[in-house]
Amino acid sequence: FPDYVDVTIPPNIAPLNFKLKDACTEARAILECGPEKLEIKTGKDACFVIPASGWKRLLRAASGNHLNVTVQAFVNDEWIAYAPFIIKVAKEPVDGWLAYRLIEPGYELWNRMGIYQRNLENYTENAIIENKMSGNNCMNCHSFCMQNPEKMLFHMRETYSCTLLIDGDKVEKLNTKTDQTLSPLVYPSWHPSGKYVAFSVNKTKQAFHMNDRNRVEVFDSASDVVVYDTQKHEIVTSPLLSSEGAFETFPTFSPDGNTLYFCSAKARTMPKEYDQVRYDLCSVSFDPATRRFGTVVDTLYKASEIDKSVSFPRVSPDGKYLLYTLSGYGNFSIWHKDADLYMIDLSTLQSYPLEAANSDDVESYHSWSSDSRWIVFSSRRMDGLYTRPFIAYIDEKGQACKPFLLPQKDTDFYFRFMKSYNIPEFITGEVKRQGRALAVKAKEDKGVDVRFK
């Protein structure tokens, strides 16, 4: 554990420490590529801790190739050998940092949560902000403009409710509820220019099942899509994005900024018909110069026709593919056991499952690396309860390779760590550490009132 057999990794990832599940007196592992060889020995704990210097040397040698791994253990007074395996090493490095929220996998109550960042080239983790700095409130929906650590936003809920938008050294507190919108701004997607952010506005409710493998349901009784102008502090929308006859949500801009993708479902009576709500994948044109939307909505994938529902559409930075989550109904797929990752080739509009990345449990939120070669996604495949981040390589044909679990220095980490990883987002560098300053901004600043235009 973890399962690293035949996975594909980037040449700049932290060492993949692992352990044997079987009891043994001692064990050894040999990792090699050509003339480069690394032997690691361990005792009864059967934990293989790979030295960083030797690991980096191996990855340099194996870039674009693979590592051969042999594991042997001394069991019942004799040496046994496990089946050898390989670890493929891609040529393309992954973005150096990963941002995520850590939270207990509960439904309504929380005590400690925060937004954190992890250096993927080692095991360094630090807090972007923690809610102990702001009255133990809820904070969520962190988002970055084109994986840029200097341009981000996130929401605070309950106490000190606001949206904090960070642009370099500038921090703005935004009061985003208007009389014309259903709610404060919710699910974000940056325009590549950084001038706009698309958001959903949602009336969201939560319910619990008495006897169902999906423990919790989160659903919208109404939702629209809007676009926020970061320079003018204005919200704009279109009747095509805010109709009473449909639930619109999960907007995401194309890399060229001229198309806005979103999910749309026929409005239903909620919560009575919660399991009849099925979202299709749609798009509308957007003119960044005039802030005007097109007059026609295109439906790219009509999931409702096959009794399925789309959530979390995300376009690769090179514009070739759109990754989304497909489940049986609704849009809160992070608790739906049947949720899987699917891809659309935007040149052909062909949709297909990422079979190598999916499992029998939940695959839900996901994001792209800046070079369109890596995705990170949250999965409950380990125990059905906690979401953990898995990283997968996307080849030139848009197919996923076998994913690997985010490596940790301690091989028992995931058995002891009682928090879920939420909204994993690749970033190209480290976010400036100013958590206390952000908390003070939320507490003491009056904030800017956003206007509906």
Residue positions per predicted region:
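Sequence signature of WD/YWTD-type beta-propeller architectures
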Residues: F1-K453
